[in-house]
Curated annotation (Swiss-Prot):
Protein name: Protease HtpX homolog
Record organism: Acaryochloris marina (strain MBIC 11017)
Binding site for Zn(2+): H131, H135, E205
Keyword annotations from UniProtKB, A to Z: Cell inner membrane, Cell membrane, Hydrolase, Membrane, Metal-binding, Metalloprotease, Protease, Transmembrane, Transmembrane helix, Zinc
Coiled coil segments of this chain: none
PANTHER family documented for this protein: PROTEASE HTPX
Major location (coarse): membrane
Active site per UniProt: E132
GO process terms (BP): proteolysis
Record-level Gene Ontology MF annotations: metalloendopeptidase activity; zinc ion binding
Recorded topology in the membrane: Multi-pass membrane protein
Lineage top rank: taxon: Bacteria
Length: 293
C-alpha cells in the first residue's frame, strides 16, 4: 500500500509538471514540452539523482584514509543490515545534518556535514548513520530524489515564466495561452509540488527512525541526536535548494505559522517520543532481532 501511495504521488507530481507547462507556456506546445520535460526529469532523476542531490550541497567524496572512523561505523552497520557499503561524502558546512541518496542500495551514497561529525558523540552518530542506511534499505532514496527533482523542475519552470511576465508581460505567449491561468500556476504549482512531497516524505521518516533504532539497539541515542540536530538547525540551518530538504534527517526551520503545514518531516518531538516508546518495548523484549521494515 505504501509503494502504491508513493507511485501515485510521483505520478501526480509528473502530471503537475505537465499541467504547469501547459498553463505557463501556453497551448499544445506547452503540453508537448511538459510531457517531454516530465519524461526527461524522471529519467534523469533515475540515473543521476545521487549526483544532483550531492551537487546541491557541494558534498565531497571521502576515502577510508580520510575519514577512517566514519567508514568503520558505516561499514559495521551496513554489514549488520546486509547492505553494500555506500559511498561516503562530507558536506563542508558547520550546520549539522545528513542525508542518503541513490537509486538503489548498489548505487547509494550517504552525506554528512562537517558540523555533524564534530557535534555528535559516537553513539548518536551511529544512530544518524543507521537512519540514513535505513532509507537506503527501505528504498526511500530514489523516491525522495525523484520527488525533489520533479518539484525542483516545477519551481524552476514557474520562476522562469514569472521572469518572462515581469519583463515581457504576456506578449510572448501564443493565442492559446491564458495569462490569468499562467499567473495562478506560477503561485500554485510550486505550492502543490511541495504538498505532494510532504505526502511522500513524512511517513518515511518514522519508518527510518524505527529501522535505525532496531539496527543499533539504541533508540535513545538516535532520539538524543535528533534533539541536538533540531537545536542546531534553529541556529545554523543547512542551505541548498529547498526542493532537496526532504532528503535531510532534520528539516531546515520554517516560519512557525507554516511549520505544521509545510514541513517535509514530522515534528522532531513526535519522532523522539516514538523512539523513547520503542526503547521501552525493546527493554521488555530484549531478544528482538533487527528486521527489514
Amino acid at each position: 500500500m505504501n509503494q502504491l501511495k508513493t507511485a501515485s504521488l510521483l505520478g501526480l507530481l509528473s502530471a503537475l509538471l505537465i499541467g504547469s507547462s501547459y498553463a505557463l507556456l501556453g497551448g499544445s506546445g506547452g503540453m508537448v514540452m511538459g510531457i517531454g520535460l516530465a519524461a526527461l526529469t524522471n529519467l534523469g532523476a533515475w540515473y543521476y539523482s545521487d549526483q544532483i542531490a550531492l551537487s546541491a550541497y557541494q558534498a565531497q567524496l571521502v576515502r577510508p584514509n580520510q575519514a577512517p572512523h566514519l567508514y568503520a561505523v558505516v561499514q559495521r552497520l551496513a554489514q549488520r543490515a546486509n547492505l553494500p557499503m555506500p559511498r561516503l561524502y562530507i558536506i563542508p558546512s558547520s550546520a549539522a545534518n545528513a542525508f542518503a541518496t541513490g537509486r538503489d542500495p548498489d548505487h547509494a551514497a550517504i552525506a554528512v556535514t562537517e558540523g555533524l561529525l564534530r557535534m555528535l558523540p559516537a553513539a548518536e552518530l551511529e544512530g544518524v548513520l543507521a537512519h540514513e542506511l535505513a532509507h537506503i534499505q527501505n528504498r526511500d532514496t530514489l523516491t525522495q530524489a525523484v520527488a525533489a527533482t520533479l518539484a525542483g523542475a516545477i519551481a524552476f519552470l514557474a520562476q522562469m515564466v514569472s521572469y518572462s511576465f515581469w519583463f515581457f508581460g504576456s506578449r510572448g505567449n501564443d493565442r492559446e495561452s491564458n495569462p490569468i491561468g499562467a499567473l495562478l500556476m506560477i503561485v500554485l504549482a510550486p505550492l502543490s509540488a511541495t504538498i505532494l512531497q510532504l505526502g511522500i516524505s513524512r511517513t518515511r521518516e518514522f519508518s527510518a527512525d524505527e529501522t535505525a533504532a532496531r539496527l543499533t539497539g539504541q533508540p535513545r541515542a538516535l532520539a538524543q541526536a535528533l534533539s541536538r540536530l533540531e537545536s542546531n538547525a534553529q541556529r545554523n540551518a543547512l542551505g541548498g535548494n529547498p526542493a532537496f530538504a526532504p532528503l535531510l534527517i532534520i528539516n531546515p526551520p520554517v516560519r512557525q505559522w507554516l511549520s505544521n503545514l509545510f514541513t517535509t518531516h514530522p515534528s522532531t518531538q513526535d519522532r523522539i517520543n516514538r523512539l523513547l516508546k520503542l526503547e521501552q518495548q525493546l527493554q521488555r523484549r530484549p531478544s528482538i532481532a533487527f528486521t527489514s521494515l
